[in-house]
Curated annotation (Swiss-Prot):
Record-given protein name: tRNA U34 carboxymethyltransferase
UniProt organism field: Hahella chejuensis (strain KCTC 2396)
Residues of the signal peptide: none
Subunit structure: Homotetramer.
Catalytic activity: carboxy-S-adenosyl-L-methionine + 5-hydroxyuridine(34) in tRNA = 5-carboxymethoxyuridine(34) in tRNA + S-adenosyl-L-homocysteine + H(+)
Keyword tRNA processing: yes
EC assignment: 2.5.1.-
Zinc keyword on record: no
Protein task: Catalyzes carboxymethyl transfer from carboxy-S-adenosyl-L-methionine (Cx-SAM) to 5-hydroxyuridine (ho5U) to form 5-carboxymethoxyuridine (cmo5U) at position 34 in tRNAs.
UniProt GO BP: tRNA wobble uridine modification
Amino acid sequence: MIRFDDFLAHADKNRLQRFIPDFERVLDERYYSRTHGDYEGWWNALQQLPTAQASQIQFDVDTLMIGAEGDLDPEEQESLIKGLRGLHPWRKGPFNFFGNHIDTEWRSDWKWTRVAPHLSPLKGRFVLDVGCGSGYHCWRMLGEGAQFVLGVDPSPKFLFQFHCVKKYAPTAPVYYLPLRSEDLPPNMDAFDTVFSMGVLYHRRSPFDHIDELKAALRPGGELVLETLIVPGDENTVLTPLDRYAQMRNVWFIGSSLATKRWLERCGFEDVRIVDEGVTSLDEQRQTDWMTFQSLKDFLDPEDFSRTVEGYPAPARAVLVARKP
């Protein structure tokens, strides 16, 4: 079983020390006391990854590079591919493991390219990434010089995909906990930068989520919020009747201006809308490493500007704000 002793040991030496009992309790409740039917298969897939020294590791590039092809012999390469395939579908990336390109469903590097120019420099910062997926952006944050990165996401498969990288960078100060933002200790006031990318619309109460993000930030800290949006003014909010782009767990999608107002209502200052754009079929698509349905299947085949339910097609915005 994947354990989190390394995170707790690191937390014992930094500003999260006083929250260790809270983390231990919630990990027991949300992870150790629960079992997923596919856990054994995912664990076996992770064990297929060869024990090898990666001759290169690069986290400051669009495709995260772990090792080189020549680091593994043919038998090890075969075992590596078997293990990585055992964790299909790969949704967030891309990665390159020892010469093997993992073409993920999402071009998460494109999102980072949109977000990164608007950030306060991450060098030396204490960073939280809520809804971190496979951890791709966590590693990019480390590549920008972050001192400590904590990613949280409740998906157990993403946890295993994260550990495919962590296996070859075990001492990197990047950690993943299989938790939701609402599971985090309250009022931490600990992080210099908090990211929430692709989470807000999945929450029944967007205000509760924003408050959780604010509580994790230190005074003066920076929030980076990336979320779905719809066209409209500060009063425009879409509440799907059932599904949105085939997703059942979408509750509220505000316009950029409405989302900005939500942040201001929750007490954030210097709120800026720094990027807006429609999600393209090149950014989210089916690949050899994600063979299920993707964005194209969720849009009206006669009109790609609408979802199959008739709503505006997915568009996204990035907002940056400061906690007073």
